[in-house]
């Protein structure tokens, strides 16, 4: 039976469906030339697509799919055609969809590709069948999507570079972004197209054309600042904001996954959240999807990130597809899902999508950058866009007719996909073409009959159903329950919370560094406080220490709970995606995180309190202990919740780390310890009552002091011994009488203005709980309503800052490149001194820990031999996970983990310290400076990496201009690079990355997938440039995915790797790839005519028994216990033979050779060989292969491999003089330092939001604190208020420096990359980083210290004022350096925050204020010298307490001393009389210094110590940042 529906005029093989009717009479006769082109390409890829379809045809032979097929049988009127189109889906139809003529691939033998693909596709057909059956309840067949005259625009703050900037844009508005005027920026304009059931639509465009924005509009992911005009209809209904997620599958460009979850765990979480299947069905679906996408072998591998080794980039992309396939078969939307995949994997992925689309009758819209002919054949329609508008939409065969009318014709042997991808570029080069500008293409399409037919069909579709009113504004239906026919969420709220809670626990447990730091922090601080305040008694000393102890507990909680900031930002992208996908409600995610935090916080607190409480010797009553535990726990939870709430509302971690300390600083100040309640001005007293620290401080004190009595030792009585008037007779003196100041706890409470009612402490519990509830509600509101989007319009549109212009001078072709070189940069680009790189017997092993905790030595690369000669290009190709990037890392000297054996020689010599000067490495992950412009980043690289002795400054700048020109970066040259989701596009980032490395004019250029993420035109241009580089005498080694035939033929040699890191071929490519194809042909593998040789070689590399090979990669490492047992058996068992002994010895040697420090980071692709039996079986299998060699053995024993080894061993050509460098770096230290200093300073200025936040924080705290201590009096309260004020300035500085850690942490990955490239010296970077921060630190310190000095009313002395602000700046600078040290040496941001909490707590505790130096136990005296805070408190105290300052007592501050004396008129009945004489404790500043054990000389000594600490931290940063590098 034939397929009667003519929705798609082409079949899977790209052939024109003769039954399809053109949309107008003028085009009923297809041009013979166009038909010839299409048919020629159809023939060229026929064998491949049909062979792949061979196995799929078996879908119809099984009864398992019968029920699914019946569900899709339907008759319907298709408004897109004038006649009735009857779709009858039966066995024959399915065969026609997937190809029923299964011809063999060439003339190949039993072991060839036909047998391989036959078995592979039979399995895949079964998997597709199972997938559709399992997900039958979630599938949505017969969907139709209509986009009718849709526009999309956003309101953006006026760009400083915008030509529309007026006089209103003042200097202030440039500094403060939110003061700029908003302007409307159009991103998408007048889009009209449709997606019908079963249609496969290929979306082709240039970078910056708004494709990703279009997908966001279709999936209802647009930001609130944007607006849509026009209609988007799904099944003739407008988008329903509540249920729209169930209408589509969307695979976006970015891969957002939690790095510490495995592939299987990530997929299972998605299945649980998005399906309502049975438990068994969910397991089958998980296994099914992993198998369809070819990632079953990495199911138990972590996803990974920049610091954690995990799956490869291509596997991450397939993981992104996997979590969407969970939804079932429905409208499919894919935004560049093949980036990072090899061509075979890309075809397999899209072929699976096409099967699902056709069999389930759902539409698919897929954007691709470099589609191969095989991939191109999968699509029925083409949608082309440029500058946010459509330049064509229609059937695949129609597009060639359309463009041929304007002089753009596809040549006979040209790939149609490449022709269409480069059509705008070709139009510029063709003088006969009538289309030049973007508007020409747009107008041409809108004047065509194809556009008119599209509008007619859209109108017919809309008229067929009158449910929609036709309003021109998009209608998002919110909360209309009567229109919801299904549940928005698949799971109940309880189940959602359970799943999120399980995931939260997994991610926390696997962050071992963070857990370890938390446990150590709680234990150490518990021991520290417990032993510092060890066994407090009833003395006056203990009475004075209790308030200090209570306050320190508050600071401990604050410093220890700020680590929650980093967690929010690491999980935010994943949460945003899953929130939009309706995985769970925001409240479920929140509650899961809340419960997780409550549990982990309790563990922290119980460790801390259990240790410290009993060591301190607080009240032994059980109820008092549990209340103490409760109070600390509630405060810890509240502080953690506030930190996370601030993070939810903050755009980045640096802002959150600035705002959160502001909150804590203010409310710590208002707690009632540093300044008593009655001393707080009435206008700030409200802050005292809403401060959570006030309630906990008072509760802890009240809990301990009620019922407590105190006594005095002789040296604690007042007036003290040695007081001049103590023994003077009354009334001039005290007649030797003394008094005990504090006799019970109630007196302490009253002195602190605390309610003495015992039940008062319970109020704090309810108030803290209320505050926790408030901040929880705010968190839920933020999670539900705030999304920091990444649509950046002004980089894509008006200013030309984001699209590839092919107009005028910016149109570059190969001839112009050659001309540009000859005229301008030939001298710079030609390499007079050549470099040879050889590698022999290169093997790479790592140690991993498997699921059963068995340690395994895994070989990732096996005996790799090869070389690269000057002027040649070597391609490293292989499937995903074959080890291409690993090999490139090793050759480029970027691997510092694992065990590398073999020989790598540069010009016949081992690599030395100058090796990286010869090479440049374009890494797969684009590590770029966020706050530099494109030109600045490239110029920075050129100026530092090009030698000054052979090139002038102008030569370097000319090189930069040339690279900008060739890579077509001029249009964005002055645009900030930004982050991945908030800057230039991914395609542009790739070109910038290549440009930065090219700027060094390397002798050997390593490139890891340089064309991934690029359009065909951009890829072609880049490879032209790279070829030109090679022709100028440089060596190029490049891994590449999905190369077009044109690009592939530019290489001179290839190194073909198989799964497991084996070599299948190394040698010349030959003219038209004949050399390598002849080699394959000799082995019985013939490349079909017209097939891309690169794709054929990838198929060839997979034609071996991978299971046995991969199993043999692993060698078990026996445990120490088993080794001892084996040795014992050998010693005592006479039957032990020499082989057993050798086996033990070999295992021991293997253990010694593996880096044991990277067990968790070295998880790789395969998880076979779970026990010794597997290895024995693999060994046996390999031994059997000797009689029937596979492609690996064939190459290993081939003449080609022997010839390669002979060439390597023969050494350098006779007379060759190797190029040598004497210095590791190309430029001097001073030049590097000033370049880095300038970059740091400029980038810091461009962080405007962060600068303004810190400025506001400094000014706000200065004003609030100053007015709180407004014009301090010289009474007794004024004495302690001065000391507490000085101490608070240190607390503010300590908390403020936390915001520096995220910035340093983010920048260090760029530092690692540039340091590996020998861009600069390690010392120059560290010095520049620290010194560049000096001006900003000075500014922040002055904004705080200068106003507050006079507001508080310290001594009216200019010298003392200048000393105050100078010492405060020094202290702040030291803390900044300390935070920079932690940012450089901590493995994670959470760990850095935990270490900061411990450090700042210790600094505050031992500064001499909370506990005086005399009261510090002898075994902790050294911590007083370690405390950085001491060196601020002491000099500022001396500065204030010396000079003309004096103090007095107000009447209520005098201490009455009882005196018994004999009056002159005494009688026998009353010989003595009791009187009271008032005592004023402090009248001079030196008394304060004496009490705190501070000397006048400390003022300057401590100042020099601060300077020394600054230098010391600088040295520590230099040392530890060189030793510790946290990379994969």
Curated annotation (Swiss-Prot):
Residues where ATP 2 binds: 878-885
GO MF terms listed in the record are:
ABC-type transporter activity; ATP binding; ATP hydrolysis activity
What cystine pairs are annotated? none
- Map out region (Disordered) in residue numbers: 1-32, 1159-1189
Subcellular location per the Swiss-Prot or TrEMBL entry:
Membrane
Keywords on record: ATP-binding, Membrane, Nucleotide-binding, Repeat, Transmembrane, Transmembrane helix, Transport
**How does the UniProt record describe the way this protein sits in the membrane?**
Multi-pass membrane protein
Q: Give all residue intervals belonging to the ABC transporter domain.
A: 167-412, 837-1085
Q: Which residues form a coiled coil?
A: none
User: What does the record list as GO biological process?
Assistant: aggregation involved in sorocarp development; culmination involved in sorocarp development; sorocarp morphogenesis
Q: Which InterPro entries match?
A: AAA+_ATPase, ABC2_TM, ABC_transporter-like_ATP-bd, ABC_transporter-like_CS, ABCG_PDR_1, ABCG_PDR_2, P-loop_NTPase
Q: Where is the composition biased (Low complexity)?
A: 17-32, 1163-1189
ABC transmembrane type-2 domain segment(s): 509-738, 1249-1479
Compositionally biased spans, kind Polar residues:
1-11
What's one GO-annotated cellular component? membrane
**Which positions bind ATP 1?**
205-212
List the transmembrane segments. Answer: 514-534, 545-565, 598-618, 625-645, 655-675, 763-783, 1225-1245, 1255-1272, 1285-1305, 1334-1354, 1361-1381, 1391-1411, 1504-1524
Chief subcellular location:
membrane
Top-rank taxon of the source lineage equals: Eukaryota
Q: Which Pfam family would be a valid example here?
A: ABC_tran
Q: Which family does it belong to?
A: Belongs to the ABC transporter superfamily. ABCG family. PDR (TC 3.A.1.205) subfamily.
Please name the PANTHER family in this protein's record: ATP-BINDING CASSETTE TRANSPORTER (PTHR19241)
Identify this protein by name: ABC transporter G family member 16
Organism whose genome encodes this protein:
Dictyostelium discoideum (Social amoeba)
> What gene name is given for the protein in this entry?
abcG16
